[in-house]
Amino acid sequence: MSFVSKLLYTVSALVLFHSGFSSYEFHHLLKLNSLNNAQGAISKLPKDIMYETYAGLILFVLAVFTSFEKLQYLPIESNDGKIISQGNYLKEIALNKATNVDNLIGSNPNGEIIFTPSFVDVHMKRKICREWASNTVKKEK
């Protein structure tokens, strides 16, 4: 977190605290005034307190956005011994470059998805096993 974001957090907290205290004072004075005066002419929060609250919220949002640190991207294959920790992200891989080797050697990079047991034709496998079993029984006789 940078110095600017810490400063903005502090200023926004002070401004919001002051606007909250001013609002409390206003409502307390309004309550005392309504006990003494039955008409109670002022019931709305003054605009300066509202503007102070909005300014504090805007400063807080700016502090949040300035507190983000620059992301550090790390390559997948690195020999410098860096360990990926929180806040560090791997660089994106261009899929067309990643699959060139797989295409040249004829392997399927999605093999673990395509060749799962749930996609195997069980009836065909049983038929092949029956034919193999019947052929081995015939050879033994």
From Swiss-Prot:
The chain crosses the membrane at residues 7-27, 49-69. InterPro entries: EMC_subunit, MMgT. GO terms for biological process: phospholipid metabolic process; phospholipid transport; protein folding in endoplasmic reticulum; protein insertion into ER membrane by stop-transfer membrane-anchor sequence. It comes from the Eukaryota. Keywords: Endoplasmic reticulum, Membrane, Transmembrane, Transmembrane helix. It is found in: Endoplasmic reticulum membrane. Residues 28-48 are lumenal. Pfam families: MMgT (PF10270). It is a multi-pass membrane protein. GO terms for cellular component: EMC complex; endoplasmic reticulum. Residues 1-6, 70-141 are cytoplasmic. Component of the ER membrane protein complex (EMC), which is composed of EMC1, EMC2, EMC3, EMC4, EMC5 and EMC6. Belongs to the membrane magnesium transporter (TC 1.A.67) family. Present with 5240 molecules/cell in log phase SD medium. Part of the endoplasmic reticulum membrane protein complex (EMC) that enables the energy-independent insertion into endoplasmic reticulum membranes of newly synthesized membrane proteins. Preferentially accommodates proteins with transmembrane domains that are weakly hydrophobic or contain destabilizing features such as charged and aromatic residues. Involved in the cotranslational insertion of multi-pass membrane proteins in which stop-transfer membrane-anchor sequences become ER membrane spanning helices. This is ER membrane protein complex subunit 5.
